[in-house]
Amino acid sequence: MVHAIFCAHGQLAGAMLDSVCMVYGEVNVSAVAFVPGENAADIAINLEKLVSAHTDEEWVIAVDLQCGSPWNAAAGLAMRHPQIRVISGLSLPLALELVDNQHTLSADDLCQHLQAIASQCCVVWQQPETVEEEF
C-alpha cells in the first residue's frame, strides 16, 4: 500500500480529504495545509512528521500546483527520501483515482497512472446537436 498526503495552498488539502471521505468513507490519506505566514520550510516540517511514521514505505504527495511552496517542500523531502513521489494537479477526480489505486499499485505505477488519466479529469460539457426528424 502507498501512503498518501494531500498538500495545497489554503484549506484545499483538508477540503479535498473531506470530499474524498464523503465518497469513500475513511481513507489512508493525510492533509497538510499551507496557510498565510508559513513558508516551504514550515510545510516540509509538517510533511516530515507524517512521513517519519512510515519511513520505509512508499508515499505519494499530491500537491495543487507545480513549483508552488507545497511542491517545493514535497520535492525537497523526496530528494532526501527516495520512497516519496510528488505529483501536481490535485483535483477531486485525481484524488479519488489515487485513493482507488493506492492499495494495488506501487508509488511509481500510481503516479504514472494518475498522469495518464489526468486529461480525463477535465471535461467540457457540450450542447448536444439537435436532429430534426423528417416526416
From Swiss-Prot:
Active site: H9 (tele-phosphohistidine intermediate)
Record domain PTS EIIA type-4: where: 1-131
Pfam families xref list: EIIA-man
Any one Gene Ontology cellular component term annotated for this protein: membrane
Subcellular locations according to the entry: Cytoplasm
Modified residues (Phosphohistidine): H9
Any Gene Ontology biological process: phosphoenolpyruvate-dependent sugar phosphotransferase system
Keyword Phosphoprotein: yes
InterPro entries in alphabetical order: Bacterial_PTS_sugar_comp, PTS_EIIA_man, PTS_EIIA_man-typ, PTS_EIIA_man-typ_sf, PTS_IIA_man
Induction of expression: By L-sorbose.
Entry's Gene Ontology molecular function annotations: kinase activity; phosphotransferase activity, alcohol group as acceptor
Keywords: Cytoplasm, Kinase, Phosphoprotein, Phosphotransferase system, Sugar transport, Transferase, Transport
NCBIfam families, alphabetized: EIIA-man (TIGR00824)
Purpose of the protein: The phosphoenolpyruvate-dependent sugar phosphotransferase system (PTS), a major carbohydrate active transport system, catalyzes the phosphorylation of incoming sugar substrates concomitant with their translocation across the cell membrane. The enzyme II SorABFM PTS system is involved in L-sorbose transport.
Domain remark from Swiss-Prot or TrEMBL: The EIIA type-4 domain is phosphorylated by phospho-HPr on a histidyl residue. Then, it transfers the phosphoryl group to the EIIB type-4 domain.
The protein's name in its UniProt record: PTS system sorbose-specific EIIA component
Organism of this sequence: Klebsiella pneumoniae
